[in-house]
Amino acid sequence: DEYKRRIAAAYYSKRVGQVVHRLATKSFDYAIVMRPDLLEMETLNEVLRVANKTTAYQWDGLERFPQVFEVIPLFDRFFVFDPNDAPKYKAKYPNLLACTNFYFDFPMPEVQVNPNEVMYAGAYQEGRVGSLLKMVDELQKYNLKLNVHLVLGWRSVAFEHPIITFSKKGVGFLSYLETARRAGMLLDIKACEHDGLSFRVFEALRYNKKLITDNKSVRLYDFYRPENIFVVEDGCFDGLSEFLAAPYTPLPEEIIQKYSFTNWLRYALDMPPYQVTDSKTWKFQLS
């Protein structure tokens, strides 16, 4: 898997390099690099050269891909989403800032929602499968429609399951969003290597969905409401029945807008007005 990941990263870096090379004679006010660890240094230097202000966003734990530490000092602003990384490395890397993932706030047509449907779609990762199976097994005890899909990529089908479906390729983002919006609840499985919140958390926030997650760090955020987000901790599902029966509690629009891509982009580029997107543990940034 590691070898294939490197091949994919090299291909991605090459494609980005080709685009940047065509822009070599131009200059830009800003450049934002998502997952800078995936770019080769030659490509990254090309990006940095054509922009006046540079921002990077690592939507993975820093220690999961440690090669990223080499490029942090190259950027004006370097954002991390794991609530453990900013406090841990801020002293060494002064340009390090905390933020979260986001949801895309472009308009979407209304859809018919099935409040009893629970949806999960994601890439197959060995470290997440055990937690996913436990959640699915527990949810099968209730009168729910479970829509659970794993994308295998280059892997073979790992096992058969009466609920979980598999495919080699994922669907387009808009198709995924439409499926997610039709569900009443979303599932979220934490990656073992970090405590950052996935995009699913913010999709649930944007579309007023209940969320079932095993990422307990979600409790640190201002949008957390126990009636909207059920946290599976140490494999314990106590209180799930009451959670499923309770109605969703709408959140203030100000909180919802805080986690939009529009606000995220203004924060990333330091273009006020914006709201800082952080957890309750990151308030040192505001001082």
PLM feature spans:
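Catalytic alpha-helical scaffold of carbohydrate-active enzymes acting on polysaccharides/glycoconjugates
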Residues: 45-46, 64
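Short beta-strand/loop segments at the ligand-binding rim of alpha/beta enzyme cores
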Residues: 48-58
